[in-house]
């Protein structure tokens, strides 16, 4: 499995990330990718890579969030790499599948944000880490939304209201970056 492109993306992001905690997470993810040749597969026991889409409207006032069915949290769309080393393509694929939005524009080929978060055990799946690379994507809020089986709901949320739905540091960091303060 080819991990060079993933490592290049991570190292480039690590060098420009302003937040010390995010820099530290990027370094942890680099070490994880270097240590696990199967990091792009769900079968990688300690965790695996995921790609997420931080979908904003053109004026950068709203973000499209999904109310995740399994986790019960409002989050950005995203999902497992399932062997695909092109995490930009993973983020775009997951965004289309989870929102029904087809007209998505990758704002930058660079990583927008990274996060490392614990996924609790569920059924036969043990707890594990998601090492998430997030990409900034633009969409038109007028395009119809289609709620997938993975979601309870979808909503375009004013950036000022994101913290009321999900006060996690990583969500607030992406809000701050979107409004130009991070």
Region roles according to the model:
Residues 1-28, 99:
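Predominantly extracellular/luminal regions of secreted and cell-surface proteins
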Residues 82-170:
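Unchanged
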Residues 8-9, 20, 53, 61, ...:
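Short low-complexity stretches enriched in small and charged residues
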Residues 166-182:
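Charged phosphate-binding loop/patch that engages nucleotide di/tri-phosphates or the phosphate backbone
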Residues 1-7, 38-48, 85-88, 123-131:
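Short charge-dense sequence patches
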Residues 40-76:
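N-terminal strand-loop-strand
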Residues 15-52:
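Acidic, metal-coordinating catalytic segment for phosphate/diphosphate chemistry
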């Amino acid at each position: 499995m080819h991990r060079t492109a993933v490592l290049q993306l991570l190292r480039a992001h690590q060098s420009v990330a302003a937040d010390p905690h995010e820099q530290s997470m990027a370094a942890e993810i680099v070490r994880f990718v270097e240590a696990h040749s199967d990091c792009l597969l769900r079968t990688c026991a300690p965790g695996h890579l995921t790609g997420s889409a931080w979908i904003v409207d053109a004026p950068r006032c709203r973000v499209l969030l999904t109310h995740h069915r399994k986790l019960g949290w409002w989050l950005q769309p995203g999902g497992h790499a399932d062997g695909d080393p092109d995490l930009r393509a993973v983020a775009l694929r997951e965004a289309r599948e989870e929102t029904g939005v087809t007209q998505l524009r990758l704002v930058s080929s660079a990583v927008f944000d990274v996060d490392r978060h614990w996924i609790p055990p569920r059924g036969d799946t043990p707890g594990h880490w998601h090492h998430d690379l997030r990409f900034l994507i633009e969409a038109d809020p007028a395009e119809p939304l289609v709620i997938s089986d993975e979601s309870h709901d979808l909503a375009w949320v004013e950036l000022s209201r994101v913290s009321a739905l999900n006060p996690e540091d990583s969500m607030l960091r992406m809000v701050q970056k979107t409004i130009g303060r991070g």
